[in-house]
């Protein structure tokens, strides 16, 4: 993050807010599936992403039928039984499967934009996504998290939504500029797709490309195990 954005964070006034006074947990239908019974890619009627406690792919690693499921979008997801309690903004359709839940902005007179949700997720993770929490030392579910306090930018005693919007917009622009510069230097800035490549992408979006499972040994046939390090291999030093 550049100096300008760091300066903005340092200069803004912050206020203390209780999670349960800003968000409410979303009630969802319990699905009659276990994770290991579901495909990990869209297949037939199994097209709705399912939320679990995993922090890979924002917790969405399985797919279920849409029928009978509570379909959510534009909410925040948080694991309730995990090794990592990282919150994510979920802009697209999904449902809750297990060991996680979704929360929604509680006030009807203001609908949060995606950038404002992203900023709040950043603030929430400062109190949930901490090394102290793990499977052995669980954070707990919404009954615990709703009593946590987060810091949000303020202006004249009110939450400064405009600051959140402009901050995330500037952060996005910075990341795009960095990527553009990298692609230019690497000679990869000419990324216009051919008609064939565009057709393949469309087939993938429509789930028309078949996938199959393969054993590692059949694809990578020269797997070598490295030497196992022992305590004697350790050297004193600072990281």
Which residues are covered by each model-predicted region?
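Non-catalytic DNA-recognition/assembly elements of restriction-modification systems
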Residues: 1-57, 155-239
């Amino acid at each position: 993050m550049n100096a300008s954005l760091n300066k903005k964070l340092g200069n803004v006034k912050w206020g203390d807010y209780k999670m349960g006074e800003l968000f409410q947990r979303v009630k969802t239908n319990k699905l009659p599936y276990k994770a290991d019974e579901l495909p990990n890619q869209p297949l037939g009627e199994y097209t709705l992403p399912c939320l679990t406690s995993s922090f890979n792919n924002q917790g969405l690693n399985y797919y279920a039928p849409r029928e009978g499921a509570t379909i959510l979008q534009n909410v925040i997801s948080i694991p309730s039984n995990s090794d990592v309690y990282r919150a994510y903004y979920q802009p697209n359709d999904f449902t809750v499967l297990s060991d996680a839940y979704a929360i929604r902005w509680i006030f009807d007179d203001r609908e949060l934009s995606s950038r404002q949700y992203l900023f709040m997720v950043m603030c929430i993770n400062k109190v949930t996504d901490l090394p102290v929490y793990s499977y052995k030392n669980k954070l707990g579910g919404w009954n615990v998290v709703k009593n946590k306090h987060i810091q949000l930018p303020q202006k004249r005693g009110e939450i400064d939504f405009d600051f959140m919007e402009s901050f995330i917009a500037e952060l996005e622009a910075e990341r795009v500029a960095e990527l553009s510069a990298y692609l230019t230097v690497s000679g990869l800035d000419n990324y216009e797709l051919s008609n064939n490549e565009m057709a393949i992408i469309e087939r993938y979006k429509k789930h028309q490309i078949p996938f199959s499972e393969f054993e590692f040994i059949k694809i990578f046939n020269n797997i070598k195990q490295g030497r196992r390090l022992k305590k004697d291999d350790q050297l004193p030093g600072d990281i």
